[in-house]
């Protein structure tokens, strides 16, 4: 808005918006250059703020600023007051700070003197002497030269933008190469990955409801296919995924080509518009060139000071003009181009528009500042204010000068050459992108030749992937062409606020118009600018394609959820990925609730069934896997126990050898061997060692390297626990106690069998043969093969080899009571009867075979060993020889005995004294002892298997009740050990039913 100069006193302006009082009146200087005699000099006083109008015609003035003051001088003077934007009351007499004296004369030359310090202009216009053609030429020429200047600046900015685009393109090409390399690595890794099943020695995998749910549920729909076929189907699925990805890539390439064609069409349209604009500018320049000459740059002009109440940032009219009229037909018109404003001064129809200003409320930056003046003698005085925003328009040929704060206007038309360069660069960039697309197509074709061997099946359409977020460098050049490009310099924030609050401006009134027009807002032409950064847009689909490839390749086995049949129940090993494709969410989508609302009842039922199948199959595989792990753990424990036992035996032998070595070093003699044939004298030491080891285990002073026997709970404790579990705890706890009870009996039975096997050795059997007393008649008979002789078993039971059918068995009294108490059903009774018959038959065979083996072993000792000793009773040497020979042969031929031969008599030659019949007899003895050990093992297996089968027949509660009854009722008269308890269970089963044929 305009500011008023103080009215009282004279002031001097120092150029810093400050006034200083002056004692002497300021001398005013005017540029008066006239060539005619009839000059009318009108001097305007600094303190005079009045407008003298000699004509009573209608005068209209429109000032730049927020306060619009209209003065109608029809023979009187009007004073107006208004408020500025900061609330200061400003009294304005007609036209503040721009005082104009208008003297209308006919055929008289007017000399207008303008005071530079106070911005007062005296303009004498001649009526009907203003020419509209001159004004139009001035406006067009000034606009044309401003456009040339703006185009030069545009070229610089476009070059910078093109350089930035090239850098961005290089970065994007590098990113594309890196992403392509990553995609190839992922594809190779996926091809090499195999389906990890839980069969055999491979791991079991993960839970079915993990990130990749689709394949897990599909695998549960068919449990009849093995893991190998599932792996083959998975390979087919991966190949079909690759096919789908390649088709998507081809579609994306086609879309990119279409976009490129559209961009080329847009560029052609831009070229046509630029040619039209250039054709419009060229005739204006040619028509205006003969009227004007080259201007001369002048010094700067001081700006009009601003009042203290109004900030200095508000644009004001700070330039003053001294215009000298040299002819009768000259009319001085001021055109303000700084803010795209044109001031028309004419006397036609007595309408005068003093000034028309447009601060460019739709613009974002000021325009170049130019001022030019011309005198009558051909000399030019140009004033370019250093702090001005409204320069004076030129009255001659213009060549604008720009300051450092100048910026490019928003709406402009670039040169044809510059546009061609931009188009060429864009075409080069498009060619590079096409080459990249060709490379991608070649890679896709190579992958198809290597991997695709089967026709593609229909798939569900994938939803478009979201484009990756662009970096700020990419987002900045990709602005909408409708929005103006941001210039390097911006207006102050206060200036933008004042521009937004300005009132509507009246349109420009041409000199040919007669009636005044109503105020209307200025309409700027919608000129379409070329999109300089349009070359970056084709790269976006490439980035989207690369992102889709990465997401699709990372989601393994998630395609064809609706068309692929159920394969197998094997649980594969899946990768936990953050991204999911739409196909993987067909059965279990990411937004479960929303998808559930759109599914039909049939689909919901199918999904629930597949989930149940997957859960059940997983539990089965998990149980199988746990059993395999437990079996392996048992094998490892047994191997560890065996190694501990071997270490213990080796240490014992080493200790014995060291003891004998110390005896021999000290000069002593080794202890004599036993006189009993087959005995070495070390058996007693072994028994003593075993007793000593047992005592150390109980005291806790055993050697840490020796094998430790784990202490197990007593049988009475387990029976009491079973009684409590039957009444209080659940079935699972009862089953756990039964398993512990079974393992305790089994371990104790194994230990008992190992101790029995120690008796089966030549020395112990010789002692047992001597204890028999009476020798049977078979001792004197020659040795015969036992298979040729048929011996009758004196201890045979009355039950024959062919037992009666189990249906004919009658239950005993106690078994009937137990069946009633335990609620045994008829099917269980039949199975118990079958078990009783089978175990009874096997037990009878084992006992019969053992009796036969014992008789043969004793007959062997009486006929072969003891008989030779009696016959050679007088010869001690032969006795020792026979004893030593028999001892050596028996201990070396028997592999299961724990005795070892220490020494052999040095005066006996084994090769000379042992004949072939004797050697055959020793082999026979070792075979008999081995058979006896096998018989003991068979009996142990029969007892354990009988108890196991009973557990399968009875329920946990019935089994616990059966054990407690045996322990409390049947064997309550005496305390039974764990081994006797196992035999008691067998006997209870054996005597549960009675065969009526043998009663």
UniProtKB/Swiss-Prot annotation:
User: Residues annotated as region Basic motif?
Assistant: 602-632
| Acidic residues bias: start-end ranges | 682-692
Q: Does the keyword Magnesium apply?
A: no
Which superkingdom is the protein from? Eukaryota
One annotated GO molecular function is: DNA-binding transcription factor activity
Q: Where is the bZIP domain?
A: 601-664
One Pfam family in the UniProt entry? bZIP_1
Family per similarity comment: Belongs to the bZIP family.
Give the matching PANTHER family.
BASIC-LEUCINE ZIPPER TRANSCRIPTION FACTOR B-RELATED (PTHR14312:SF7), CREB/ATF BZIP TRANSCRIPTION FACTOR (PTHR14312)
Protein name, as recorded: Probable basic-leucine zipper transcription factor N
User: Which organism is this protein's natural source?
Assistant: Dictyostelium discoideum (Social amoeba)
Lineage of origin = Eukaryota, Amoebozoa, Evosea, Eumycetozoa, Dictyostelia
């Amino acid at each position: 808005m305009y500011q008023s100069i103080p009215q009282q006193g004279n002031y001097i302006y120092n150029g810093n918006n400050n006034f200083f009082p002056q004692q002497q009146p300021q001398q005013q200087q005017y540029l008066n250059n006239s060539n005619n005699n009839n000059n009318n000099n009108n001097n305007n006083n600094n303190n005079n703020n009045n407008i003298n109008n000699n004509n009573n015609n209608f005068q209209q003035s429109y000032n730049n600023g927020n306060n619009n003051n209209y003065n109608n001088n029809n023979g009187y003077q009007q004073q107006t007051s208004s408020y500025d934007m900061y609330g200061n009351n400003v009294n304005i007499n007609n036209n503040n700070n721009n005082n104009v004296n208008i003297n209308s004369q006919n055929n008289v030359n007017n000399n207008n003197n303008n005071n530079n310090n106070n911005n007062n202009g005296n303009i004498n216009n001649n009526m009907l002497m203003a020419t509209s053609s001159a004004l139009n030429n001035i406006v067009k020429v000034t606009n044309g030269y401003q456009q040339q200047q703006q185009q030069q600046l545009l070229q610089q900015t476009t070059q910078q933008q093109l350089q930035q685009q090239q850098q961005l393109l290089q970065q994007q090409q590098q990113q594309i190469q890196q992403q392509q390399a990553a995609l190839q690595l992922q594809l190779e890794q996926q091809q090499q990955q195999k389906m990890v099943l839980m069969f055999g020695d491979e791991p079991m995998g993960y839970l079915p409801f993990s990130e990749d749910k689709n394949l897990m549920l599909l695998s549960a729909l068919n449990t009849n296919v093995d893991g190998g076929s599932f792996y083959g189907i998975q390979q087919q699925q991966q190949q079909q995924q690759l096919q789908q990805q390649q088709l998507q890539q081809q579609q994306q390439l086609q879309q990119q080509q279409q976009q490129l064609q559209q961009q080329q069409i847009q560029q052609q349209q831009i070229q046509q518009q630029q040619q039209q604009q250039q054709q419009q500018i060229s005739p204006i320049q040619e028509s205006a060139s003969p009227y004007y000459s080259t201007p001369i740059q002048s010094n700067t002009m001081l700006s009009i000071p601003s009042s203290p109440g109004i900030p200095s940032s508000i644009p004001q009219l700070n330039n003053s003009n001294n215009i000298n009229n040299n002819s009768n037909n000259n009319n001085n018109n001021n055109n303000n181009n700084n803010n795209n404003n044109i001031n028309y001064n004419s006397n036609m129809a007595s309408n005068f528009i003093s000034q028309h200003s447009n601060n460019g409320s739709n613009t974002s930056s000021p325009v170049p500042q130019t001022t030019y003046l011309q005198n009558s003698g051909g000399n030019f005085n140009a004033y370019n204010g250093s702090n001005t925003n409204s320069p004076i328009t030129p009255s001659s040929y213009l060549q604008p000068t720009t300051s450092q704060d100048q910026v490019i206007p928003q709406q402009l038309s670039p040169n044809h050459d510059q546009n061609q360069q931009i188009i060429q660069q864009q075409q080069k960039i498009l060619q590079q992108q096409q080459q990249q697309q060709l490379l991608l197509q070649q890679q896709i074709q190579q992958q198809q030749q290597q991997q695709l061997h089967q026709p593609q099946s229909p798939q569900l359409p994938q939803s478009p992937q979201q484009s990756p977020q662009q970096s700020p460098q990419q987002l900045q050049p990709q602005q909408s062409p409708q929005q103006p490009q941001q210039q390097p310099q911006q207006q102050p924030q206060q200036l933008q606020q004042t521009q937004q609050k300005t009132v509507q401006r009246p349109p420009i009134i041409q000199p040919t118009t007669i009636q005044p027009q109503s105020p209307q807002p200025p309409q700027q032409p919608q000129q379409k600018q070329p999109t300089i950064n349009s070359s970056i847009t084709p790269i976006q689909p490439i980035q989207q394609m690369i992102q889709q490839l990465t997401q699709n390749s990372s989601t393994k086995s998630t395609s064809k959820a609706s068309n692929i049949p159920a394969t197998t129940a094997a649980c594969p090993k899946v990768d936990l990925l953050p991204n999911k494709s739409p196909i993987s969410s067909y059965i279990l989508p990411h937004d479960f609730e929303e998808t559930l609302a759109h599914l039909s009842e049939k689909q919901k039922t199918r999904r629930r069934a597949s989930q149940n199948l997957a859960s059940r199959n997983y539990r089965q595989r998990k149980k199988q896997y746990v059993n395999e792990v437990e079996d392996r753990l048992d094998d490892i424990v047994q191997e560890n126990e065996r190694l501990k036992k071997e270490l213990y035996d080796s240490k014992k032998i080493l200790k014995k050898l060291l003891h004998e070595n110390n005896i021999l070093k000290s000069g002593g003699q080794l202890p004599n061997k036993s006189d009993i044939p087959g005995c070495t004298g070390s058996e007693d030491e072994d028994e003593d060692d075993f007793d000593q080891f047992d005592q150390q285990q109980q005291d806790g002073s055993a050697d840490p390297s020796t094998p430790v026997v784990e202490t197990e709970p007593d049988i009475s404790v387990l029976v009491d626990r079973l009684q409590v579990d039957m009444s209080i705890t659940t079935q699972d706890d009862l089953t756990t106690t039964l398993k512990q009870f079974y393992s305790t009996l089994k371990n104790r039975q194994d230990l008992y069998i190992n101790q029995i096997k120690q008796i089966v050795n030549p020395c112990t059997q010789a002692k047992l043969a001597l204890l028999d007393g009476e020798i049977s008649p078979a001792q004197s008979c020659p040795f015969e093969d036992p298979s040729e002789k048929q011996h009758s078993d004196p201890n045979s039971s009355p039950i024959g080899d062919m037992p009666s059918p189990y249906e004919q068995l009658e239950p005993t009294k106690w078994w009937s009571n137990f069946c009633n108490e335990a609620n045994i059903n008829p099917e269980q009774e039949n199975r118990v009867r079958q078990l009783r018959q089978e175990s009874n038959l096997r037990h009878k065979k084992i006992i019969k075979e053992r009796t036969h083996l014992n008789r043969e072993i004793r007959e062997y000792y009486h006929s072969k060993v003891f008989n030779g000793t009696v016959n050679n009773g007088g010869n001690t040497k032969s006795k020792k020889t026979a004893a030593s020979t028999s001892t050596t042969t028996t201990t070396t031929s028997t592999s299961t005995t724990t005795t070892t031969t220490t020494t052999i008599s040095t005066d006996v030659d084994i090769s000379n004294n042992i004949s072939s019949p004797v050697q055959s007899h020793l082999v026979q003895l070792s075979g008999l002892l081995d058979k006896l050990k096998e018989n003991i093992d068979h009996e142990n297996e029969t007892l354990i298997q009988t108890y196991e089968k009973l557990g399968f027949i009875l329920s946990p509660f019935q089994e616990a009740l059966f054990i407690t009854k045996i322990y409390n009722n049947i064997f309550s008269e005496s305390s039974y050990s764990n081994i006797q308890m196992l035999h008691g269970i067998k006997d209870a089963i054996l005597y549960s039913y009675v065969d009526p044929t043998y009663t």
